[in-house]
């Protein structure tokens, strides 16, 4: 697989789209939120798929994320990404649900845009329907089949 820094792409996408919210709180908040969401996604994936996803990253990012691995939790769903976003932002009472959803959606969609087709297909097989839909992975399967 050709290396691609999907983590940095997700961070940049979140930061550019939600700069007014993130910068008002902390200039490193996009990096923190992205890291927390990445760890959640990796925890949801089987070890082989998570390892392949981590393998696409530069060594520094790989080391940070691979430390968080170690379990495969099939109970993690889309609402967990929303909750993780809210609590990662640091002020649960100030963050609107729509903003948290938009940040989580941006993260998930950006990753699916940046990874190779082979990994998209694996993730489409491994993830529940709602996460697949948020990542546009259902379309990936249909496109590949056509």
Please provide the spans of the model-predicted regions:
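General marker for long, soluble alpha-helical cores
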Residues: 1-146
């Amino acid at each position: 697989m050709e290396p691609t820094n999907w983590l940095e792409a997700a961070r940049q996408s979140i930061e550019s789209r939600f700069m007014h919210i993130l910068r008002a709180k902390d200039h490193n908040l996009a990096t923190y939120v992205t890291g927390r969401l990445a760890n959640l996604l990796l925890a949801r994936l089987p070890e082989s798929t998570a390892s392949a996803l981590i393998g696409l990253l530069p060594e520094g990012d790989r080391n940070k994320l691979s430390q968080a691995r170690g379990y495969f939790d099939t109970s993690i769903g889309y609402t967990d990404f929303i909750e993780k976003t809210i609590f990662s932002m640091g002020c649960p009472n100030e963050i609107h649900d729509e903003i948290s959803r938009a940040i989580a959606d941006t993260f998930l969609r950006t990753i699916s845009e940046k990874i190779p087709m082979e990994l998209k297909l694996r993730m489409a097989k491994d993830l529940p329907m709602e996460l697949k839909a948020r990542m546009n992975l259902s379309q990936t399967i249909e496109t590949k089949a056509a």
